[in-house]
């Protein structure tokens, strides 16, 4: 995905901190999938379970930050996008990439023993990590409408405040109350929570919120005092993610993902903190031209890295027996992450050298 905006003179300029965030986010996404590999199969009291809780919780900002990066670019008034370009470039590229890689993963599943019918049908839904492509196409389609929201400061603030409450605060508070298990209230709260979930089904999701939030945070100057408070809140959000997941899972006697959702307040705090830190911590440094080119080069390969990384993780496990429990879990996880990141980068870089694949597949 491109990472350029129009400058005042009409020239396109890279936004380097968005490139840095994209690279960090793809690494975090890989770690998320690797740490989840055997997590649910472990006993809740196994030390490895807690390790994966710590590692997985540390990565949960990756999808929200990806969405904020896209929002910062697609909703930027200095980066006009025609409907023709939106459909024939952005949407078409995602669709063709999905079809190609869905076939690759379908064939991979078939070669690994999945019945031909199931392997064929999996092409229509894609591999487990490819749900994001459905989401991003939907956001591309509604981005012209969301530009109207972003273009009016009052409407934008109302939207962010309204859906911060509806999509994040209210359901999160109900989840916390259910976690406390106040006597004689559990059944009633559960019924209310289920009813609220039905309401959420008719509202724009937290993913649209992150898309719009990215534009807001990218364009707004945030005072240093507020940034420090947000960073502290982000750390608290991370600690809360780990502890709340642990508590909820022990309560239900299985791995419970309630507080790992993108719509959890704790994940929101982490995500906003990471994005703002990227904006101010990375953009105000003056890297040399060599480092700048390297960052841009890796960033431009991240889409291909996202598409292929799951294949590498599975190949390491199924063909070489390397997974997070092969030996000491932390070392195994970091080794798999290193191999996956480097391998994904090499494959994406090679595919990007073939013009037609670069245009439509990666």
Protein language model annotation of sequence segments:
Residues 1-362:
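Alpha-helical transmembrane segments and their immediate juxtamembrane cytosolic regions
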């Amino acid at each position: 995905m491109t990472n350029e905006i129009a400058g005042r003179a009409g020239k396109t300029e890279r936004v380097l901190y968005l490139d840095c965030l994209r690279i960090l986010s793809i690494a975090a996404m890989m770690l998320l999938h690797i740490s989840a590999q055997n997590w649910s199969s472990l006993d809740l009291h196994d030390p490895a379970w807690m390790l994966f809780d710590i590692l997985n919780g540390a990565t949960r900002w990756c999808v929200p930050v990806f969405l904020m990066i896209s929002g910062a670019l697609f909703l930027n008034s200095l980066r006009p996008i025609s409907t023709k370009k939106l459909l024939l470039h952005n949407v078409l590229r995602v669709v063709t990439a999905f079809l190609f890689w869905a076939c690759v993963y379908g064939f991979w599943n078939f070669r690994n023993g999945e019945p031909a019918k199931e392997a064929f049908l999996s092409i229509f839904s894609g591999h487990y990590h490819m749900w994001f492509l459905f989401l991003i196409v939907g956001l591309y389609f509604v981005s012209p409408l969301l530009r109207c929201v972003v273009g009016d400061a009052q409407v934008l603030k109302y939207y962010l405040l309204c859906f911060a409450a509806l999509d994040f605060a209210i359901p999160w508070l109900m989840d916390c109350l259910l976690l406390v298990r106040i006597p004689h209230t559990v059944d009633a709260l559960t019924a209310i929570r289920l009813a609220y979930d039905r309401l959420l089904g008719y509202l724009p999701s937290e993913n649209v919120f992150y898309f719009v939030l990215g534009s807001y945070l990218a364009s707004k100057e945030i005072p240093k005092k507020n940034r420090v408070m947000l960073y502290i809140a982000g750390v608290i959000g991370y600690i809360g993610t780990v502890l709340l997941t642990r508590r909820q899972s022990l309560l239900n006697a299985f791995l419970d993902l309630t507080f790992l959702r993108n719509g959890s307040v704790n994940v929101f705090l982490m995500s906003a903190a990471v994005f703002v830190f990227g904006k101010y911590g990375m953009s105000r440094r003056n890297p040399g031209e060599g480092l700048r080119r390297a960052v841009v080069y890796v960033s431009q390969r991240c889409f291909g890295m996202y598409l292929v990384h799951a294949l590498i993780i599975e190949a390491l496990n199924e063909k070489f027996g390397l997974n997070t429990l092969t030996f000491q879990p932390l070392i195994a996880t970091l080794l798999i992450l290193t191999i996956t990141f480097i391998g994904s980068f090499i494959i994406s870089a090679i595919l990007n050298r073939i013009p037609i694949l670069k245009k439509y597949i990666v």
